Amino acid sequence: MMLEHVLVLSAYLFSIGIYGLITSRNMVRALMCLELILNAVNMNLVTFSDFFDNRQLKGNIFSIFVIAIAAAEAAIGPAIVSSISRNRKSIRINQSNLLNK
């Protein structure tokens, strides 16, 4: 696969994630869009690491760290959402202002 195809796909995924994150009112949908953004960044890291410096695996190793962070976010995010939905009876972002009591 050519470099341009992978970069266009990554930019497309990143754009979908940003659009969904900005327009989403649901916390679960926002978490899914954040995962799309992280996956697009991982695609860029691996692609540029493979294209520019094939001997050193800096992009691949950094991508593994990003995957670990995404896994932690995927584990903790739904727990936070379920806690908020239990307390506030809603998972809408605009109704979950926890600083105002």
UniProtKB/Swiss-Prot annotation:
Q: What is the stated purpose of this protein?
A: NDH shuttles electrons from NAD(P)H:plastoquinone, via FMN and iron-sulfur (Fe-S) centers, to quinones in the photosynthetic chain and possibly in a chloroplast respiratory chain. The immediate electron acceptor for the enzyme in this species is believed to be plastoquinone. Couples the redox reaction to proton translocation, and thus conserves the redox energy in a proton gradient.
Q: Which domain of life is it from?
A: Eukaryota
Instruction: Describe the subunit structure.
Output: NDH is composed of at least 16 different subunits, 5 of which are encoded in the nucleus.
* Record carries keyword Translocase: yes
The organism's taxonomy opens as:
Eukaryota, Viridiplantae, Streptophyta, Embryophyta, Tracheophyta
Catalytic reaction list: a plastoquinone + NADH + (n+1) H(+)(in) = a plastoquinol + NAD(+) + n H(+)(out); a plastoquinone + NADPH + (n+1) H(+)(in) = a plastoquinol + NADP(+) + n H(+)(out)
Q: Which GO terms describe its cellular component?
A: chloroplast thylakoid membrane; NADH dehydrogenase complex
Which top EC class is named for this enzyme in its record? translocase
> By what name is this protein known?
NAD(P)H-quinone oxidoreductase subunit 4L, chloroplastic
Task: Look up keyword Ribosomal protein and say if it applies.
Answer: no
The protein's organism comes out as Lotus japonicus
